[in-house]
Amino acid sequence: MTVNTPANPDILALGEAMIEFNQSAKGEPKYLQGFGGDTSNFCIAAARQGARTGFVSAVGADHFGRLLIDLWERENVDTAQVRVDPQASTGVYFVSHGPDGHAFDYLRAGSAASRYAPHDLPLDAIAAAKVVHLSGISLAISLSACDAALEAIAHARANGVRVSFDTNLRLKLWPLNRARAVMLEAIRQTDICLPSWDDVTELTGLTGRDEIVDFLLSHGPRVVALKLGKDGSYIATPDERRVVPG
C-alpha cells in the first residue's frame, strides 16, 4: 500500500524516518514526541525553500507511521512513494539526557524502512526526478535497504538524474571497513557529495581540507560540500573552491 499526494517531485530522497522520544528533563520519566530521519529532514527543509520534494521509504501500518505521513503532508512533501508495510512497525528512538550528555537508543530492527528492498523502488519516479538524495544511513540500516539505495543511485545515473549523497556515518549501524567500502562505491556515482568533517576524516584517514576534497573529487563527484560545523562549509569543484560561512 502507498499513500498518494498530487505532486511531481523534482527532488526524491530515499531513507529512513523515525519517531523520536526526547527526554524532557534529566532524570524525569517524561519524553516529548518528535520526528527524526536525516533524509526526511532534508526533504522537509528543501520543501520549505520552495522545492518540490518527495520521500521514498516505508512506514508501518501503525499510529506512528500515520504521524509521519501527516508530517510530510503538512510540509508539502510528496508521499506517493511511501509504502505502508502491514507486517512491520515504524522505527522509534529515545534521547536521554545525563551528566555525560545525550544518549540515543534506537528500536529499528525489523522496522518497515529496514525491510525496504530493490523491488520496492519506484523506478519511474526516480527516472523522472531531477535529483535523488541519499545518505550513509540509507545504506546502513539493513542489507536490503543498502541494495535498494545502490540500485536507486544506479537507476538515477542511467537516466541522467543527479545524485546527492550525505555521508552521515553511524558506526553503531555497521563496521568501519564495510562503511568505507560501500560509501566509496556510492560516492563514485555521486554528483554532489555532502560529507561532514568527522565522517570524512574517519572514512579516509586524511586530515587536510584540500587533500580531503581532492580525494573525493577524484572519485567522481562534481561538487563537494565539506561541512565544517560552526565554521561553515568548504565548497569545491574541479575549477573552484570557497568557504561559505556558517
Predicted regions and their residues:
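Conserved N-terminal subdomain of the carbohydrate kinase-like
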Residues: 52-137
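Conserved beta-alpha-beta core of the PfkB/ribokinase-like small-molecule kinase fold
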Residues: 131, 137-214, 221, 231-233
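Short beta-strand segments
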Residues: 13-15, 105-108, 133-135, 166, ...
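Residues that scaffold the ATP/ADP-binding catalytic core of kinase and kinase-like folds
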Residues: 21-22, 105, 130, 203, ...
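Glycine-rich phosphate/adenosyl-contacting loop at the front of the ribokinase-like
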Residues: 2-78
